[in-house]
Amino acid sequence: MPLLIEHGPTATTRQIAEAAGVAEGTLFRVFPDKRALLFAVAEHLLDPDRGEATLADAVADAADLESKVIATIEQSRTRMEQVLTVMTALRHIAHDEGGGDRPPSPPAFLVEANRRFLDAIADHVFAPHADELRVTPQEAALVLRSLVFGMWHPGTSAESRMSADQLASILLKGLAR
């Protein structure tokens, strides 16, 4: 997985096999092609149980809502960068295989992982502080996730990005003075 995160679509099956400590042919006994291998990696990376456990660990020691939100933003950013790298690799492979005429729909595991991660944010971060919110915990989770995605989207320049502290402040206190 780190190899794919580092190299994305340019990672070769030889590099992947070496990183896994197996012969390249072994990969193709398990996976029919590089696309299937990358999908398996993406599905592993997005494992909803692992995502929820990682989030729960990230916010476990946070005493207040702001600390939980900052920890969640930092954890979500790291996860999003990894996911975007792997999903970009998948998109390149689909395009190279002739599937580039229309945008592919997201794989079912991606939709499910996103839904469960939003539920985990709502449950672990916002539900314990529901009385401090003007919206439901689920709506707060969606807004947080949208801010993180927008701030660290590949099209956003590094100079324009705000820190987790800044995003948490905007999320919890708004934009107005």
Predicted regions: what they are:
Residues M1-L4, S76:
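Short hydrophobic clusters on alpha-helical segments that form packing/core surfaces
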Residues L3-A36, A40:
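Helix-turn-helix
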Residues I5-P9, R50, T54-D57, H92, ...:
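Short, flexible helix-adjacent loops and helix caps
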Residues K34, V41, L45, T72, ...:
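Hydrophobic/aromatic residues within well-ordered alpha-helical segments
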Residues E43-Q75, E81-Q82:
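Amphipathic alpha-helical linker/stalk segments
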Residues S67, Q82-A89, E97-D131, P137-L142:
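Amphipathic alpha-helical packing segments from all-alpha helical-bundle domains
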Residues A71, T78, R116-V135, A141-R177:
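C-terminal peripheral helix-coil segments that are non-catalytic and often amphipathic
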